């Protein structure tokens, strides 16, 4: 039956071809070309169909040792890789070990992905793009950021805004009913316009800051990953990872995608971000081989083959349902919220009293209209007029609340933080937590690492000793050189790459590893690939920051376990303590006598005194095939000295911090002699400190002190050598207990506890692990201590800018409240209308905040003492300045309120316009005074802040428009040049007053102590 069907299909195809071949004879020339194309297409399909039927016929092809059957009906895009996306996704998500084995294990999977465990992906052509198209990119779909409309809605949730809108609606309705649409819409419409303007400015400002924080969030998630491509180890963005990539993993790294383990030693993974379990999971070729995106490497090192990226990973699917929280509230914002609430309560009380007084005066008939007639005449007054009058009073009272509540304070903090974060990125500091910006300004102690932070991290081997002799490799026996080759090539996490003959070598790994590899290749003529190919690794003990060493148990390929060799590498004095013999230059193993040991110690000390990092190599034959590496009775191969020069400018940065009252402490893993030499070179240790025996000590000694001894000595310690991450944590805790605000730098995974414990954690962007970065508040992108000093300056600038704005806004709040209250009680009316007060509110909250929040840091900030943990937010200096200016403004404006008409011989409306205009101009001139809390010269550096100048110009222009051209909207009257001159003169008087007031000394004891720094939780 099957044969008949097949024959029938063949006959049918044959007939179809014959018919098509006859068709061109009956067609016109214009259609023949199209018909021929159709024939070609039909023939192609027919031939393929015939081939398919032929292949299916049993017995047609005799079985051979190797044959391939092609199913043309089931072609997929990822057949090029011999495995489909669904299979790959299922592999890791479900830890499908059975499926992995069916693919031939990790090596078979890598082959199916057209990759290589040693060489990685071949990048030639469009291979990377093909993988991205087939398997997807390593990016996550996140919840969309908040749009502008969201912030508009948030602004309208403000109760005072809603009350004002209600008042505006009633005022609009009664105005139109009483005066008609043409004349009656002004009062209510003006309030509507003013409210919508305030809402629009607030929403746009918050929207822009949110976008800014989103951008910074994206930058912080763009981490660098080590991969192998074309046999070359290189660093790429996590977003550029593709399926098939061979990723190199070390302690502290984040796993960038889902994948399988292909090689490595003692790899332990922290999967708590995925499973919630705190226990580390071991990953190996014989057990669990699966690695999840988003997890962290807790110990060991290795390589993984990427199987799924982006949204195909379990982490990606989880992240797609999580929205970024950009509403993080800093400690300062919390304090300002409390301040705003306290002032708001005062404003509410004043507004209630004003409303009460206005209502009493209205209903007792003491208020009069513009014609001099009583506004309320008992039963003869229409109900509409009464309601309209009451609505105006309520609007005035509510507007007083709007002005009284310093809502601009949180906005000022947001603006300052957003501006500072953007500028700090240019200064090589990426802020991860907003609170760090302001807290850094209070820092009293900075605990810094040495390597890469104070030094260039450009290491080079400058000294080497073979036995007790210093010399060149050419004078050393071949046996010693071979042992060095083994000890360097097999006991490293770095790699060597050379693309083709004639090109330079490329070294990867930590700076120390690269220096050692470079020395071994160039001086000892080590062929790393050859050494690796000739030997097998039996067991590895990775570098330990406590023991300061790493080791490997290895053997030659094809040789029994009796020829195992242990190689150790690490801190010279630590390795020396493990040795009982040493190799001399000729390769003879000699017993290490006490005199020899003393001589080696002197060699180490002499190199350390030259600021060299001393690394020793030792070995021993080990016939036992066990996992515990031999740690005693080793033979010392040699000692090398690695030079890591101080960074240019680091001494100046240290001096700047010390001049600013910030104590610098260096915490390093180097020996005490190297640490002392570097500290002197960097300016951390002064000649006086060198005479102090307590200024420099080792971590073990500090660790062994009692808690009372540590607290008593910690402030005098300048350098801690041979320290562990636990020692750093101990020091941070002690300093915090003494009341210090502590900043700590760190780059390793083990630094995470100290970074979290510190008030400000500063991780290194180049050498720092992902664990360290995630535990920190700020990432120093260039690993430079000078950038740490810059962060300190920016921290002080943030705090200083916010204090400037607080002083400026509270001056306005006090003046506006007093003027309206006194006028309402005495005259039964408020000189500043709802629209005018909303305009003042706009000037203060947005334009004023923008002008004062974007001041750049000055060197004067580094001449002050640290703010500390208990400093009040509003200082005595600020109280002096704001009360003096507020008193002046209140005095002048009350004179205008009660004597303005007689002094200037003007109408009531012109008098009120004079009050409004003078009040606004006073704030403009007072913004200059607010630029400096202490300095008399408020114009210094003004030309550098174009934004400030621009805002002042815009404010003045808009004020002129409000007074001269929007008189119906703003309820003002036009002023002549003389009246403008009077307003400007009164406002300008705030400059000399500010100059004089700053000459008045203030007591050191604070007027108020309820606004204090609290410890960061």
Swiss-Prot record:
Presence of the UniProt keyword Transmembrane in the record: yes
Xref: Pfam families: Cation_ATPase_C, Cation_ATPase_N, E1-E2_ATPase, Hydrolase
Compartments reported by the entry: Membrane
Transmembrane region(s): 148-168, 187-207, 337-356, 394-411, 803-821, 833-853, 874-896, 906-926, 945-966, 977-998
Regulation of this protein's activity per its record: Activated by calmodulin.
Membrane disposition: Multi-pass membrane protein
Keyword Hydrolase assigned: no
UniProt GO molecular function: ATP binding; ATP hydrolysis activity; calmodulin binding; metal ion binding; P-type calcium transporter activity
Catalytic activity: Ca(2+)(in) + ATP + H2O = Ca(2+)(out) + ADP + phosphate + H(+)
Entry EC number(s): 7.2.2.10
UniProt keyword terms in alphabetical order: Acetylation, ATP-binding, Calcium, Calcium transport, Calmodulin-binding, Ion transport, Magnesium, Membrane, Metal-binding, Nucleotide-binding, Translocase, Transmembrane, Transmembrane helix, Transport
SUPFAM superfamilies in the cross-refs: Calcium ATPase, transduction domain A, Calcium ATPase, transmembrane domain M, HAD-like, Metal cation-transporting ATPase, ATP-binding domain N
Comment text on domains: The N-terminus contains an autoinhibitory calmodulin-binding domain, which binds calmodulin in a calcium-dependent fashion.
Function comment: This magnesium-dependent enzyme catalyzes the hydrolysis of ATP coupled with the translocation of calcium from the cytosol out of the cell or into organelles.
Protein name according to UniProt: Putative calcium-transporting ATPase 13, plasma membrane-type
Phylogenetic placement of the source organism: Eukaryota, Viridiplantae, Streptophyta, Embryophyta, Tracheophyta
């Amino acid at each position: 039956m099957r044969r008949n069907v097949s024959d029938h299909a063949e006959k049918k195809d044959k007939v179809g071809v014959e018919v098509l071949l006859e068709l061109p004879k009956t067609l016109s020339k214009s259609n023949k070309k199209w018909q021929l194309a159709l024939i070609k297409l039909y023939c192609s399909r027919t031939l393929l169909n015939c081939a398919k039927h032929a292949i299916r016929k049993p017995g047609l092809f005799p079985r051979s040792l190797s044959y391939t059957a092609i199913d043309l009906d089931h072609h997929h895009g990822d057949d090029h890789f011999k495995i489909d996306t669904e299979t790959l996704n299922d592999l890791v998500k479900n830890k499908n070990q059975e499926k992995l084995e069916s693919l031939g294990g990790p090596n078979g999977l890598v082959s199916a992905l057209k990759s290589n465990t040693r060489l990685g992906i071949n990048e030639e052509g469009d291979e990377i793009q093909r993988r991205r198209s087939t398997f997807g990119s390593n990016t996550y779909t996140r919840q969309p950021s908040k749009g502008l409309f969201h912030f508009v809605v948030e602004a309208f949730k403000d109760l005072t805004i809603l009350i004002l809108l209600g008042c505006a609606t009633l005022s609009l309705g009664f105005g139109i009913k009483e005066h008609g649409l043409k004349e009656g819409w002004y009062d209510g419409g003006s309030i509507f316009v003013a409210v919508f303007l305030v809402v629009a400015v607030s929403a746009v400002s918050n929207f822009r800051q949110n976008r800014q924080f989103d951008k910074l969030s994206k930058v912080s998630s763009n981490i660098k990953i080590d991969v192998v491509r074309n046999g070359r180890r290189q660093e790429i963005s996590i977003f550029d990872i593709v399926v098939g990539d061979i990723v190199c993993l070390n302690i502290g790294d984040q796993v960038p995608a889902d994948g399988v383990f292909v090689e490595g030693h003692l790899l332990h993974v922290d999967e708590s971000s995925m499973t919630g379990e705190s226990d580390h999971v071991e990953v190996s070729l014989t057990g669990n081989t699966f690695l999840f995106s988003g997890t962290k490497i807790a110990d060991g090192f290795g390589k993984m083959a990427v199987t799924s990226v982006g949204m195909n990973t379990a982490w990606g699917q989880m992240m797609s349902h999580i929205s970024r929280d950009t509403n993080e509230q800093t400690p300062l914002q919390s304090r300002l919220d409390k301040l705003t609430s306290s002032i708001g309560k005062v404003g509410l009380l004043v507004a209630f009293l004003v409303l009460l007084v206005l209502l009493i005066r209205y209903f007792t008939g003491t208020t009069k209209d513009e014609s001099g007639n009583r506004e309320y005449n008992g039963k003869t007054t229409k109900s509409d007029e009464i309601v309209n009058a009451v609505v105006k009073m309520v609007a005035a009272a509510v507007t007083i609340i709007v002005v009284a509540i310093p809502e601009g304070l949180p906005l000022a903090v947001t603006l300052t933080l957003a501006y500072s974060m953007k500028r700090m990125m240019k200064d090589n500091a990426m802020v991860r937590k907003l609170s760090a910006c302001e807290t850094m300004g209070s820092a009293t102690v900075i605990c810094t690492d040495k390597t890469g932070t104070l030094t260039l991290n450009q290491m080079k081997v400058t000294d080497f000793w073979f036995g007790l002799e210093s010399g060149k490799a050419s004078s050393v026996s071949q046996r010693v050189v071979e042992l060095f080759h083994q000890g360097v090539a097999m006991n490293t996490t770095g790699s060597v790459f050379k693309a083709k003959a004639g090109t330079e070598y490329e070294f990867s790994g930590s700076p120390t590893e690269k220096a050692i590899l470079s020395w071994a290749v160039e001086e000892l003529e080590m062929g790393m690939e050859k050494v690796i190919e000739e030997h097998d690794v039996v067991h590895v003990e990775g570098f330990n920051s406590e023991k300061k060493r790493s080791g490997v148990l290895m053997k030659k390929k094809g040789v029994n376990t009796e020829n195992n060799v242990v190689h150790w590498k690490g801190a010279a004095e630590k390795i020396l303590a493990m040795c009982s013999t040493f190799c001399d230059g000729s390769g003879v193993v000699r017993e290490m006598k006490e005199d020899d040991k003393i001589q080696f110690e002197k060699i180490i000390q002499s190199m350390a005194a030259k600021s060299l990092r001393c690394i020793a190599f030792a070995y021993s034959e080990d016939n036992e095939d066990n996992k515990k590496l031999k740690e005693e009775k080793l033979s010392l191969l040699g000692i090398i000295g690695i030079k890591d020069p101080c960074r240019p400018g680091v001494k100046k940065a240290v001096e700047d911090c010390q001049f600013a009252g910030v104590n610098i402490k260096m915490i390093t893993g180097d020996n005490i002699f190297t640490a002392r030499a570097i500290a002197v070179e960097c300016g951390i240790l002064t000649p006086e400190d060198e005479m102090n025996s307590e200024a420099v000590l080792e971590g073990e000694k500090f660790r062994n002190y009692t808690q009372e001894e540590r607290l008593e000595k910690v402030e005098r310690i300048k350098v801690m050598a041979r320290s562990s991450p636990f020692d750093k944590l101990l020091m941070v805790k002690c300093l915090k207990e003494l009341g210090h605000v502590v900043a700590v730098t760190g780059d390793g995974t083990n630094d995470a506890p100290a970074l979290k414990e510190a008030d400000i954690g500063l991780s290194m962007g180049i050498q720092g692990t992902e664990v360290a970065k995630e535990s920190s508040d700020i990432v120093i992108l260039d690993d430079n201590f000078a950038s740490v000093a810059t962060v300190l300056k920016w921290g002080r600038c943030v705090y200083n800018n916010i204090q400037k704005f607080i002083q400026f806004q509270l001056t306005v709040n006090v003046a506006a409240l007093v003027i309206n209250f006194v006028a309402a009680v005495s005259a039964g009316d408020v000189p500043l209308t709802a629209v005018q007060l909303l305009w003042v509110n706009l000037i203060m909250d947005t334009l004023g905040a923008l002008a004062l929040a974007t001041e750049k840091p000055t060197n004067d900030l580094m001449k002050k003492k640290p703010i500390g943990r208990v400093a009040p937010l509003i200082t005595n200096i600020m109280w002096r300045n704001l009360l003096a200016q507020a008193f002046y403004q209140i005095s002048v404006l009350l004179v205008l309120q009660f004597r303005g008409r007689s002094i200037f011989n003007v109408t009531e409306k012109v008098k009120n316009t004079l009050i409004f205009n003078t009040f606004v101009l006073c704030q403009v001139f007072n913004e200059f005074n607010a630029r400096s809390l202490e300095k008399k010269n408020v114009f210094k550096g003004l030309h550098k802040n174009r934004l400030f100048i621009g805002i002042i110009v815009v404010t003045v222009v808009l004020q002129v428009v409000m007074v001269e051209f929007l008189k119906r909207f703003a309820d003002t009257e036009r002023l002549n040049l003389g009246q403008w001159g009077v307003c400007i003169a009164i406002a300008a008087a705030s400059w000399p007053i500010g100059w004089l007031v700053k000459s008045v000394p203030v007591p050191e004891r604070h007027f108020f102590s309820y606004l204090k720094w609290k410890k960061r939780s």
